[in-house]
Design a protein with these regions (language model features):
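Surface-exposed acidic, glycine-flexible loop patches that form ligand/cofactor-binding
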Residues: 35-36, 64-71, 99-103, 162-167
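N-terminal cap/lid segment of alpha/beta-hydrolase-fold proteins
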Residues: 16-24, 28-70, 142-145
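Cap/lid segment of the alpha/beta-hydrolase catalytic domain
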Residues: 4, 85-89, 111-163
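Loop/turn elements at helix/coil->beta-strand transitions in domains of secreted/extracellular proteins
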Residues: 71-75, 105-111
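Stable alpha-helical elements in mature extracytoplasmic
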Residues: 19-26, 95, 99, 149-153
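Catalytic histidine neighborhood in serine/cysteine hydrolases
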Residues: 1-8
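Short beta-strand element of the alpha/beta-hydrolase
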Residues: 62, 71-83
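Short amphipathic alpha-helix adjacent to the substrate-entry channel of hydrolases
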Residues: 90-108
């Protein structure tokens, strides 16, 4: 798109490398007091099926620095955009968003849950409009803490805070 100017490095318009480290800028703002503690880490696939709710894929990703293997690290949840799930772009968002590099330096786990496309949600978006519940509900819950996807995300975070290795299924190659 023209709005991107000359910034087309790194792929399509979903994940670009434009000389700015937006992930680090955002996380430094959110966590200004996090000390730097360099550590290697790995991007892992994990089985999301136990958190099964309408719209979630069977597999997600989690990035865990070595310093977080024993638990006790904060968790940041990174939700992909529409048409950015694993089925559409593979692990591109989880691998190249820039979040993993920051997480390695600051001892933070990054959770990349994944959605799936369906007839009700062909672009695999997160449920911001209510496709996962009855459209006839008087007080819809999809955009509250009581929504099915929000509850599943919180269950994933709680599991990771207990033991980051628990939901891990398999390791992928080292991530950026």
């Amino acid at each position: 798109p023209q709005s991107l100017g000359d910034c087309h490095l790194g792929g399509g318009s979903h994940v670009l490398a434009c000389g700015d480290n937006v992930a680090a800028d955002m996380l430094d703002w959110l966590y200004p007091e996090r000390p730097v503690q360099e550590s290697e880490g790995e991007l892992r696939r994990f089985d999301q099926s136990e958190f099964a709710v309408k719209g979630l894929a069977d597999t997600g990703y989690v990035f865990v620095p070595e310093t977080c293997d024993a638990g006790g690290c904060p968790v940041t949840v990174a939700l992909h955009g529409c048409q950015m799930n694993d089925e559409a772009i593979g692990d591109t968002f989880a691998r190249y968003s820039g979040l993993n590099r920051w997480a390695e330096e600051h001892g933070q786990i990054i959770l990349y849950p994944q959605t799936e496309s369906s007839m009700a949600n062909p672009q695999a978006c997160w449920d911001w409009w209510g496709f996962a519940e009855s459209t006839w509900q008087i007080n819809p819950l999809h955009d509250t803490r009581e929504g099915t996807q929000a509850k599943a995300l919180m269950a994933m975070v709680e599991r990771l805070q207990e033991a980051p290795d628990a939901p891990a299924e398999e390791s992928t190659q080292e991530a950026d």
